């Protein structure tokens, strides 16, 4: 597999990584319709764990079948497919080598009571990812949660193991819990902070939600206003989040968020493009 100058430039930012990890990143970046451009779209399918099967798949019954999601990622020309252990296992042989996969190694469910201390359980490991031929592991952290430190400690250990065997690391960094307000979960100061924490934890690919213009923290508001940090447009906010990830030296993917019509999806994609993000991860089936 040859790589393009755009992909080579991205890989050069990961100065400490071994050839195995860089090869797996290259597989993701060279896959699909955006292959070689430095942009990517990841299909994450962990809704069944998060919300239950009926809420996730009943509107589109073929989606109950794990093979559907592999096929969707392939037919749509996406960059990678991310899912929990059972979903990857169910299609690992049939689709081996056809689409880069990201094993989601922690998960949560909507039955738990945890408004101030949301967390996720570790549900798979690095050896599972190797056994299934995955290119990366994926892990969610909840900055702001009363259990955030435990989650950070877990991913620090998992990331070290993954990198040692040549796997890439994807961190979903979704602020929630603790003293954060609901609008604060997507506030620009909080999103940028959460993305920066994921970079500090060693993520190769960082996934956050598209930020709003809201500023949650009074201390941050003084800095944003005093330094005249531009957060007026979606593109300027994306640019600031990317800047917060080592000035663009890490791949930043933005969640697709709530379901949108075609115009809404295109507008969001343009903002991410104009802000220097590496595109979106869609979560709807």
Model-found features: residue ranges?
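Alpha/beta enzyme core
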Residues: 1-2, 35, 40, 47-252, ...
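N-terminal basic, low-complexity leaders that serve as flexible interaction/assembly modules and, when applicable
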Residues: 1-46
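Conserved small/polar residues in nucleotide/adenosyl-binding loops
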Residues: 283-285
């Amino acid at each position: 597999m040859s790589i393009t100058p755009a992909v080579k430039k991205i890989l050069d930012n990961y100065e400490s990584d071994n050839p195995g990890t860089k090869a797996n990143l290259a597989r993701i970046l060279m896959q699909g319709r955006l292959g070689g451009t430095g942009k990517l779209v990841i299909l994450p399918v962990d809704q069944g764990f998060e919300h239950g099967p009926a809420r996730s798949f009943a509107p589109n019954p073929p989606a109950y079948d794990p093979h559907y999601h592999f096929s969707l990622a392939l037919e749509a020309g996406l960059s990678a497919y991310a899912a929990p252990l059972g979903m990857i296992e169910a299609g690992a042989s049939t689709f081996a080598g056809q689409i880069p996969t990201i094993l989601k190694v922690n998960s949560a469910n909507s039955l738990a009571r945890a408004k101030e201390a949301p967390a996720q359980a570790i549900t798979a490991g690095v050896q599972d990812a190797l056994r299934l031929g995955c290119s990366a592991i994926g892990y969610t952290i909840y900055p702001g949660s009363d259990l955030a430190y435990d989650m950070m400690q877990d991913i620090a250990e998992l990331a070290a193991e993954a990198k040692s065997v040549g796997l890439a690391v994807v961190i979903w960094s979704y602020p929630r819990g603790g003293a954060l307000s609901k609008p604060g979960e997507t506030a620009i100061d909080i999103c940028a902070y959460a993305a920066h924490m994921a970079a500090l934890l060693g993520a190769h690919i960082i996934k956050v939600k598209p930020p709003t213009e809201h500023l949650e923290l009074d201390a941050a508001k003084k800095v944003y206003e005093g330094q005249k940090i531009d957060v007026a447009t979606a593109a300027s906010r994306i640019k600031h989040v990317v800047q917060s990830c080592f000035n663009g030296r890490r791949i930043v993917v933005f969640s697709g968020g709530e379901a949108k019509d075609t115009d809404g999806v295109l507008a969001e994609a343009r903002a991410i493009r104009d802000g220097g993000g590496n595109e979106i991860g869609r979560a709807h089936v």
